């Protein structure tokens, strides 16, 4: 599982805490 609380790449829609994958 990958958890992000930031925008990893410009243009992606990640702006919050996102969890995905194993």
From Swiss-Prot:
Keyword tags: Chloroplast, Membrane, Photosynthesis, Photosystem II, Plastid, Thylakoid
Superkingdom classification of source: Eukaryota
Entry's induction text: By light.
Cellular component aspect of the GO annotation: chloroplast thylakoid membrane; photosystem II
Subcellular location: Plastid, Chloroplast thylakoid membrane
One of the protein's GO biological processes: photosynthesis
Family under the similarity heading: Belongs to the PsbP family.
Purpose: May be involved in the regulation of photosystem II.
Name used for this protein in its record: Oxygen-evolving enhancer protein 2
Native species: Physcomitrium patens (Spreading-leaved earth moss)
Lineage: Eukaryota, Viridiplantae, Streptophyta, Embryophyta, Bryophyta
């Amino acid at each position: 599982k990958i958890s992000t609380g930031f925008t990893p790449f410009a243009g992606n829609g990640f702006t919050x805490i996102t969890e995905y994958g194993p």
